[in-house]
Amino acid sequence: MAANNRNPESVIEKGKTRLTPPPLYKVILINDDFTPMDFVVKVLRHFFFMDEEMATRIMLKIHTEGAGICGTYPGDIAATKVQQVNEFSKQNQHPLMCVMEKE
């Protein structure tokens, strides 16, 4: 015969688990006077998967307004994109800067 080991103190209460979405960050390219426009378009297409038209539109916004948002991502993805773009720019000897800003 099996013993009934139900102890009222060992009952696990079901609680409501609330998941909150992670904070989002804008990834922003900053204009400079030296990076060629076609390089900016290349960065937008390669790292942010934009088509030619969208990349050109964002590049012109960066050029005329001084900065442009490339996308909005959770913090770890935004940080990775910023690092990748900044390293790629440096490797290609361009001063193009990419930063992230909390939304």
UniProtKB/Swiss-Prot annotation:
It comes from the Bacteria. SUPFAM superfamilies: ClpS-like (SSF54736). Signal peptide: none annotated. GO terms for biological process: protein catabolic process; proteolysis. It holds the Pfam family ClpS. Coiled coil: none annotated. Involved in the modulation of the specificity of the ClpAP-mediated ATP-dependent protein degradation. Binds to the N-terminal domain of the chaperone ClpA. Belongs to the ClpS family. HAMAP family: ClpS. This is ATP-dependent Clp protease adapter protein ClpS. It comes from Nitrosomonas eutropha (strain DSM 101675 / C91 / Nm57).
